[in-house]
Amino acid sequence: NVEKKVKSKLIIIGEGPEMEKVNQFLENNPELISKIRLLGKVNDLYRILQLSDVFLLPSEQESFGLAALEAMAANTPVISSNAGGIPEVNIQGETGFLAEIGNVEAMSNYCIKLLSNEELLAQMKINAKQQAIKFDLKNVLPVYEEMYKTTIENFKGKLTKV
């Protein structure tokens, strides 16, 4: 759908049990082979993400969304499913878009929206990077340290030896 509206190419990175389904899909749809690249495991993921306009994360389950953060750190907006902890990372309409799990049509429409609007894409690239910076260890570590200190202070004198 996306390629019909906006010149684009789908790049699939990584390996795993789903690759068999992808290969079967391409076997059954040979006209799509020229529009999809299967890179498998890569050593230069950050560089590939930097060169990408959009990162798709159609997870059915996701605890935190580290892959989304990696894409955002490379200035790449994320179009993801609304699964697990992803909405805490990917902010709807700011760093990318969220779609209901399995809603491929919504994800396609978000791709078209981003890829056909250079101004929106440029702003989301900036927002994505800013969001990733919030999760950088040097920004997160002091928050955790303060939480631990507060917890320890609150329990001082309240603990008894058994």
Residue map of PLM features:
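A short hydrophobic beta-strand element within the catalytic core of glycosyltransferases
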Residues: 55-56
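C-terminal alpha-helical cap of glycosyltransferases
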Residues: 137-162
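Short glycine/serine-rich donor-binding loops of glycosyltransferases
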Residues: 65-68, 86
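Conserved acidic donor-binding segment of nucleotide-sugar-dependent glycosyltransferases
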Residues: 92-93, 97-104, 113-118
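Short hydrophobic beta-strand element within catalytic cores of glycosyltransferases
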Residues: 77-80, 90
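A conserved nucleotide-sugar
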Residues: 1-37, 120
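A short, well-ordered alpha-helix in the C-terminal region of glycosyltransferases
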Residues: 106, 113, 120-134, 143-146, ...
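Aromatic "clamp/platform" in nucleotide-sugar-dependent glycosyltransferases that forms part
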Residues: 41, 60
